[in-house]
Amino acid sequence: MTVPLIQNPEVLESRLKEIPAEPGVYLMRDATDQILYVGKSKKLRSRVRSYFRFTGDLSPRIQRMVVQVCEIEFIVTDNESEALALEDNLIKTYQPPYNVLLKEDKKYPYLCITWSEPYPQIYITRHRRLNQNQDKYYGPYTDVGLLRYTLGLVKRIFPLRQRPKPLYKDRPCLNYDIGRCPGVCQGLISPEAYRKTVAQVAMIFQGQTDELIRELKEKMAQAAQQENYEAAARYRDQIRGLEQLGQSQKVSLPNSTASRDAIALAMNDSRACIQLFQVRAGKLVGRLGFVAENRGDDPALILQRVLQEHYQYCDPVEIPSEILTQYELPDRDFLESWLSQKKGRKVSLLAPQRQSKAELIELVERNAQLELARSQRLAEREAAALERLAEVLDLPEPPRRLEAYDISHIQGSDAVGSQVVFIDGLPAKQHYRRYKIRNPQVRPGHSDDFASHAEVARRRFSKMTSEDQPDLVLIDGGKGQLAAVMAVLAELGLDHLPVFALAKREEEIFRPGDPEPLRLPPQDPARLLLQRLRDEAHRFALAYHRQQRKLRQQASVLEEIPGLGKQRQKLLMEAFRSLARIQVATEEQLAQVPGIGPKLARQIYRYFHPEAETELPATAE
């Protein structure tokens, strides 16, 4: 079908009748089969039909979309929650031009508690692993420095495991001696007792610090009555630490003790900046920012999309019972039903007009306006830097897509390459790529930066398409690295691409065919932009190199276990994700890994716990 449905009423009506009145997702395609829009509804038929009534309810942008629709597809789901999750996945996969698309602003950090382990770890991460259903993620948090400070303070208040893996095989480390750790590595505390401590820590990150303080005060009083003064003093110190944490972590809002989220936005011609405030027990405990392109969307639709994105991966305990919105949402009933089902209790979405709730929305909106102004200043600064870059490098126009490449290794060991991408002067991390160097000439004791750069260039640019063609390529290095890359591009017929190298010492810019490097003043906007691009490539390559080196070192430990070949080592690492978790796993957990079995699990366990070999089974009387 290449004719728009709007031009063929009979076909349109036939297509609409095929759509069931059930929950699900619909996809609208144009004459080239491109997906223009993805939507969801409790009743697919009535929602899709509403696009073709032309009653004036549609925005001008959506009206432009409707006249292009040549085909409508639908996917029926069992319920609204499945429809919302599917819609979210399809939008992220296909990036339809008429959907509200959130920009890759930043990955906020989370706090993870690994309840899937007998002795749960508590750590900060920017990557949520959704396949471990028992693990809990708290956040996201906008200030990673404050999160690190909070976690550090929590680890001083409560005795928790301080290391991901034991320092010694046969004895606890200094953290046990000074009371910072209960001796997890040597089994000096039972999993049940340790998990009770971790549950108290979880209350802090669920916004239940006041409740935890009340609980500890009751225990302190009870311990004092029983003349257990050592325990009472320990509870007293924990209470003081929690009160200090509460003072440093939260901002009180006037005339409120409620827990709710509030969301508002500010827009200009190009973008929308959205702010979401998280209020728990009358205190502001978190503030999140989102950025969306402004393509003529209804502001309420943008807010709705952000809420879907945010709560999609939230733990149910993180969803408040009340969410305040700047505008009335078009799918409010749908979202309330989905959130209530996810939380297991009623969740209300309100667009307040007066009193304290409206004042909170006004506060969020003011912060969104400030963020929009900051974002606009940043965009103008980057635009000026790109114009300057085009000027000094003789480019026909300011480059939009910039790519940088770096190599990282130690004397040829664990050699890797990195590709980072900036779009409009800002990192576009969804386009970053990492490369393991495969060249046999690059091996421990034999490094070859030129060959490594050539390999990465060949692997990247042999697969280049018109959609990901860079406007500028930057190599971390000097003349030699630049020549190696240009030789590969010449083989591929791509030597017309603008490629440059930036040397670290003098920050000299090398250009193909020019024996003299270009030197720019230290504060030149073009130089500063190239330095940021190069430094990001270096950071990304170094992080990947360290990861590969760590994996190799972990694998070398596993290689010492008899009967544990490469394939089984890989299965163990995939199941537990780190050597530290393998070391503290029980025999039963090890045996559950496919391909391991009880016998090999016992062998692995005894390798890390040699004291277990001396424990004889009890004999029958």
UniProtKB/Swiss-Prot annotation:
Residues 21-100 form the GIY-YIG domain. Keywords: Cytoplasm, DNA damage, DNA excision, DNA repair, Excision nuclease, SOS response. It is found in: Cytoplasm. It holds the Pfam family HHH_2. Residues 210-245 form the UVR domain. One of its GO terms (biological process) is SOS response. Coiled coil: none annotated. The UvrABC repair system catalyzes the recognition and processing of DNA lesions. UvrC both incises the 5' and 3' sides of the lesion. The N-terminal half is responsible for the 3' incision and the C-terminal half is responsible for the 5' incision. Interacts with UvrB in an incision complex. PANTHER family: UVRABC SYSTEM PROTEIN C, UVRC/OXIDOREDUCTASE. This is UvrABC system protein C. It comes from Synechococcus sp. (strain JA-3-3Ab) (Cyanobacteria bacterium Yellowstone A-Prime). The lineage of its organism: Bacteria, Bacillati, Cyanobacteriota, Cyanophyceae, Synechococcales.
